Amino acid sequence: MRKKNDLEIIYEDDWLIVVDKPSGLLCMSTGKSNEDTAYSRVYDYAGKIFIVHRLDRDTSGLLVFAKDLETKLALQENWEEAVLERRYSAVLEGKIDDDEGWIETWLYENPKSLMVHCYGLREGDSPQKPPRKDWQFAATRCRTIKRGEIAGKPYTIVEFDLETGRKNQIRVHSQWIGHPIAGDRKYGAQTNPFGRLALHAQGLSFIHPWTGRTMKFRSKTPQKFKI
């Protein structure tokens, strides 16, 4: 592993670069040419580069870049088929009694507020079909890792595996089950014990677009995520 501009490079070959993005760093610029982003740091290291997928600013963890347009398109156009695993670790508010679970809902992003809204899996709802045609199906597997307390308040460490990759999916699904991610005030959190969003992209596995190899990457969960 190497560090360039404080961005840890997990893997690099002739086509791909996989980095470990810190929390608080945008993936790409919002329009400011001199804005510090994961993209600008990788560009300074490798030159022309293409981002394959994104993480929220406050989410840390594994992020994939392509070194050429063909590789980017090869991955993006077949992303759902190529990806074998997308695993996240999070600290949720409250005590979750279940050891594992499965969340299926429909998600919709409000174009004005940019908030993602959830529908399904409550009494009276019909998750088999969306309330409107512009809602997207989202499915998440979850597994309880540890239950504990911080300053007398209950928290639960949970691993999430994405079956679909919707915007803010884990954040919205956590709010939906009544246990927002610690530090996620946008989606209902009341506490911020770590001074950041307690969400980390810790595992990623996909089929390499050119070699056909199964690529598996892991990022250590931040040490501060302790309860």
Which ranges hold each PLM region?
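RNA pseudouridine synthases
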Residues: 1-227
